[in-house]
């Protein structure tokens, strides 16, 4: 009977740690997005972007930050998204007089 109680304690402890590990984030940024905007955003309204990859989402996403401070998710492989990224990269690499 003592062996059964000890075994039960070990199993419950192991189960508790397993649940704790599964509940941990996967190491990505907390602002991951799986719901993306399909509509094109004008480049002149964009300020910056960051790429997001997460095991929780089936695709790569980009989070654009607008000049008004809003964050908008978009699928990274859409043509307008690639053009917007190239535009922002060029804009930030161009030296200002």
Curated annotation (Swiss-Prot):
GO biological process: antimicrobial humoral immune response mediated by antimicrobial peptide; cellular response to ethanol; chemokine-mediated signaling pathway; cytoskeleton organization; eosinophil chemotaxis; inflammatory response; positive regulation of cell migration; positive regulation of natural killer cell chemotaxis
Glycosylation sites: 29
Residues annotated with Pyrrolidone carboxylic acid modification: 24
SUPFAM superfamilies, per the entry: Interleukin 8-like chemokines (SSF54117)
InterPro entries reported in the protein's UniProt record: Chemokine_b/g/d (IPR039809), Chemokine_CC_CS (IPR000827), Chemokine_IL8-like_dom (IPR001811), Interleukin_8-like_sf (IPR036048)
GO molecular function list: CCR chemokine receptor binding; CCR1 chemokine receptor binding; CCR2 chemokine receptor binding; chemokine activity; heparin binding
Stretch forming the signal peptide: 1-23
Disulfides per UniProt: 33-57, 34-73
Keyword entries, A-Z: Chemotaxis, Cytokine, Disulfide bond, Glycoprotein, Heparin-binding, Inflammatory response, Pyrrolidone carboxylic acid, Secreted, Signal
GO CC terms of this entry: extracellular space
A Pfam entry, by short name: IL8
Record's subcellular location: Secreted
Subunit text: Monomer. Interacts with TNFAIP6 (via Link domain).
Protein family (similarity comment): Belongs to the intercrine beta (chemokine CC) family.
Biological function: Chemotactic factor that attracts monocytes and eosinophils, but not neutrophils. Augments monocyte anti-tumor activity.
Protein name: C-C motif chemokine 7
Organism: Rattus norvegicus (Rat)
Organism ancestry: Eukaryota, Metazoa, Chordata, Craniata, Vertebrata
Gene of this entry: Ccl7
